[in-house]
Amino acid sequence: VIWIGTGQIQQRWDVVDGDGVYRSVDAGQTWQHLGLEATRHIGALWVDPRDEDIAVVAALGPVFGPSAERGLFRTEDGGAHWKRVLFVNDTTGAADIAYDPQQPDVLYASLWQMQRHPWLDYFQPTLGDHSGIYRSDDGGRSWAQVAGDGLPAGPLGRIELAVAPAHGSQRVWASIQTSGDGGAVYRTEDGGAHWQQVNADKSLASSYMGWLTADPVNADTVWAGGQPLRRSTDGGTSFTIVRSSPGGDDYHALWIDPNDPQRMIVGADQGAVVTFDGGESWSSWYNQPTGQFYRLAVDNDFPYRVYSGQQDSGTVSIASRSDYGRISFRDWNPVGGDERDGDVPDPRDSNIVYGAGLGGRISRWNARTAQVQNVSPWPVSTYAKDPVTVKYRYDWITPLAISAVPPHAMYTAAQVVFRSADGGQSWQTISPDLSGADASHDTATTDCKDAPRDRATACGYGAVFSISPSPLQDGLVWVGTNNGRVFMTGNGGEHWDNVTPASLEDWSRVNLIDASAADTATAYIAVDRHRLNDFNPRAYVTHDAGKSWREIGHGLPAGAYVNVVRQDPQRPSLLYAGTSRGVYVSFDDGEHWQSLQLNLPTTGVNDLLVHNGDLVIATQGRAIWVLTDVAPLRHLAAVSPSSRQIASAELIAPAPAMRLRFNQNKDTPLPPEEPTGENPPAGAILDYILPDGFSGPVRLEILASDGSVIQSFDSENLPPKAKAKVYFAKTWLGDPQPLPATPGHHRFVWNLRYAPPPTLESEYSIAAVPEIETPILPDGAFVLPGKYTVRLSAGNKSTEKELTVVMDPRVTATDVELAELLSFQQEVAAVLQRTVTLAGETQEPKEEHQAEPGVDTPKSIATALTALAIDLEHVDAPPTEPQRAVLASEADRLKRLQAD
């Protein structure tokens, strides 16, 4: 039985909310939602070790506004019903629960009074007079405040607790955040009646990373989180760093095996790591897809690379496709920026990458030298500084964009917009303060230090948050601010129009803007109001340059606030939305939406974009994903809603297919346990839809221009496959299936090859990917670039679509050379066919070594020609003279053998 409470209590700019409590009774195979969704942020759970249906939940509650859905909640029937057993007020929630499993009736809990403001990254009001420690002696039914002497005076912030074992629940540690950016660790030996400060290191108590975990066996050992992972073996008096790195890793959680304290799991910003020796050595967090990404960009190379900055793990440039079967560490490199960076490659030269990092820093990374230059408009960092005290103020994310239109100007912004036409060597300020700040305000006064919402804008807390240059017109730029304002310039900043939608309220963050690739007057904005305690989806579109806006978020689920909306560059009515609850698609310009989750994890999507027919998304803590080839979605967007309900089988027009080899590996493949990303298919992606109630055989045929069938695939049989000796674990073998023939949408990939040539003995390729493909060689010659026909036969209907095969742009071979290669491969196949036929007509010695030396046999000829055929399949180049000589020699041997 596993219980989960959702929603972070770590107080940070992008704190993630949850939707209550879940429980599994089958070790995580299935889950049941048990309510408390309005609590939003759950800090801890206690499950009675004597009865798995009894639990207590510590709910911090909504962090951006008052709510009664906070405090301690208890259930005695497995979550069917909940009773709030401790509540102080609508701004004070519960942060932690601690107990000794040997004394399950005695529980300790901490309450935390706090509230976040949308205009602040740091300096949030995280202290309150109602924060404190509470104790229950009846399994959480009733609670009393612990007011023992020695505790610090209020106001207090986040309090984290740990109960030592074998002390009758009397020894308790508390890390307590106090005023003046202070904090310390306290300990009681009498269940809370008396406390003493045992460690004055304020970094042990914080609103973001402060936590304590007691060793389940040793009563003197306690662990603490923070930038490093720390351990005390003297009751908290001193702590030593067990694990960390320069820059800090931010450790947030620790589980210790109660039966073997040497075995632990610790969770950090990057992921989770495991130790079996008490922290002497650890596993890697690079074996799990836990990257937390903010902004996306791609380059114009092939294969294109994806760029982003992740939380506490730096920047990423990673190939969207690998030449070696799967995307691995070989396909990744950093690009010199900061954590939570927005990284944008120069559209003219992908070796130059610009990064927008902490506190307004803009960097320029050169792949040729690996050097990073600070090219900020004002190279004085404002990181972690009060925004009303600095020259230029930035939000958590510094916006950065490069125009796709020559001369490819680069834009960034604080409260004003900057433009550079020379790669950041110089900048021009091209806007006034767009945040709405009142220049007459004295920002040093206390009314701005603790400004309420109605004065925050005037005080100068606002900043530009998103920039979108038009991909159609130089100088046409849209910007949005974190306090709910939208502006547009059509002349490079000489004049700005305030085009804010009338219904957009103050401090509604304009998270991302998408300037249309189809129309200069069209733009989409994603509006995030969850920092105003409004979790409803908000997004808008204008088709008249901001004169009017239409809200398009209504069809999205409640609670799925919108981070990004992008228009498909080929189908203007096709939209994609990234929300706090996943990805959605609209086929009618936002009038209606439906889920596009498919196999995605349920997590927030911070950014997405469409490139080369692929949909690329950046998630909040679950890596980068790609939906390869959105041709089916474009097809649906192009037809009327009534036409989407098909009555007969339908073949979707395929996108151009590139001649690619799925795996070029010639070395020992990476082992199955090596973490990798999935390579996109290599070949023609063929999508077809079968109507409801369909039954019957399905066939796909590939036809040449003369109508001859190149390849055929059906739902009843797999294509004949040569036999080869399996000398490795079956993990490496894929599981090919016949064409699907069930109702619904199906996808099949043709590898753009003719059928393999006949052989007497095939072999498995070393270019293998576990559980996906270990090809049997020879694999067949590639078809030439050009036009082909795909025919779908389903039931009594046949449908044909044209398929265009194009060349890998990296290949320099001419059409004449490719035709020469194919002709030679066909010659080799013809001689092989005659050799195999002859072998079937003769009695050849069972083992090659039984033949007399120097005597020609069909097998020896076939062996040489099979090796030649395999070599020819590996490259796009005309055959060499030695290869031609081998074919001639083996053909002569065959003639002599036939004559004999």
Q: Whereabouts are the PLM-identified features?
A:
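Surface-exposed coil/turn segments at beta-strand junctions on protein surfaces, enriched
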Residues: 154, 167, 518, 679, ...
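Beta-strand-rich binding/interaction modules
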Residues: 365, 686-687, 694-713, 787-791
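Low-complexity, Pro/Ser/Thr- and charge-rich linker/hinge segments at domain boundaries
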Residues: 633-663, 802-836
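Glycine-centered tight-turn motifs at strand-turn-strand junctions
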Residues: 709-781
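Mature extracytoplasmic or organellar-lumen-exposed domains after removal of signal/transit peptides
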Residues: 787, 794, 801-803, 836-900
